[in-house]
Structures are given as structure tokens and as C-alpha cells.
Amino acid sequence: SEGGRVVLKPNLIRHFNPGEGSVESVVTHGAFLRVVADYAWLAVGRNGSVVIAEAPQQDCKWAIVSEYAGIDRLVDHFARMGLTLEVVDIRREEVDLVDGIIVGRVTLPGDPAGYRVVDLGDLSFFSESGLDAKRFRGADYDPGPTSEHHSNGRNEYLISETVLSSDLVINLPKLKTHKKTGVTLALKNLVGINGDKNWLPHHTLGNPEE
């Protein structure tokens, strides 16, 4: 509606493709985002706002992936029309990896609107999974935060306030294969609304039988 706020949630996973394909084959392209943004502004008008918000993988170089995906050109395109397309990197931290080892960390500005702790409690599938939270592993070496936020009845996630406070979120995933889930679609794409992915259990320590 007029004056509303719309968030576009693309998949900007990484600034490179670890496989043999191009970067464009693993990220949501700006040409697709532009068309959706056009319709978003038709809905909210010039008094409304349209935001691209994403939390790519922790080692992703935002400036590079933004260039590959055409985000910078998209911002310029709407600026020529007198419209400000906001772009938010939801991550609180970026890391440098060498051979899979973290060798450096950079604190990022994060979500300018802040974050909200969302506790799913018993509504989380983890609550009845029978899994030992002490064996949960997230996106970093330290298992502490992952276990802490998924124990004693808690199942907490640090979610972007930009996303939660918007009037509408339009999920714009990239259709591609995934080594764990088979395919990456809209549900998997929502991993990127988490400000700290170490709150999100990615793995469980142990062998397959355990």
C-alpha cells in the first residue's frame, strides 16, 4: 500500500562459485530484482521504500558479489528515477578464509534497524528431535552460541529487524542444486535473514549412526 516498506530477499550466497560454473549461476541476478522492484514501487509509491536485504555466507565479499549480481547498477538505475533503493548487508561479521581456515575477521555495521531475538521454543522441530544440543555446530568454530541458543527449552534465532518490520517480504531465491538439501529454493533462502548464522544449527557432531 501507499507509503509501505517492501524487502526483496535475493540469494547472494558468495562472490565466487566453488564449482565450475559462473557466479551468475549461483546468485539472484539484478535483472530479476529490477522487475520485482518496479512492481514494489508501484505498490508503495514514492513515499514508500524498497530494500534489498541479505546475509550471504560469512566469507562473501559484498562489494564483489554486488557487482556480479548487478546490485550497484540497479541502485544507479533507480537513482536516475529519483528513487532510493536501500541495500542492507544483514551480517554482523565477515571472515577471511584460507583453505577453509578463518584467518581474519571484520566487524560489519550490520542491520541499521537492529535485530530481534526470535524464540520458537517448543514450536521448533529441534524441540522434539531427540538431538543433543551440545553437539550442534553452526557456521563458526565456536559451538558455544549454537548450543546456548538451542537448549533449556530455547530455540532462538537472531533475525533482521529490517525484514521483520517490513510490510512485505518478497523471497527471490536462485534455483540451484545443494549438497545437503538437494535444491536451494525459497525456504533455504530464508537462512539469509539471520544476523548471526552461528545461532543456526548447521551440523551435528558425530557419525551418521549417532
Task: Describe the residue ranges of each PLM region.
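N-terminal and secondary-structure boundary signal
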Residues: S1-E210
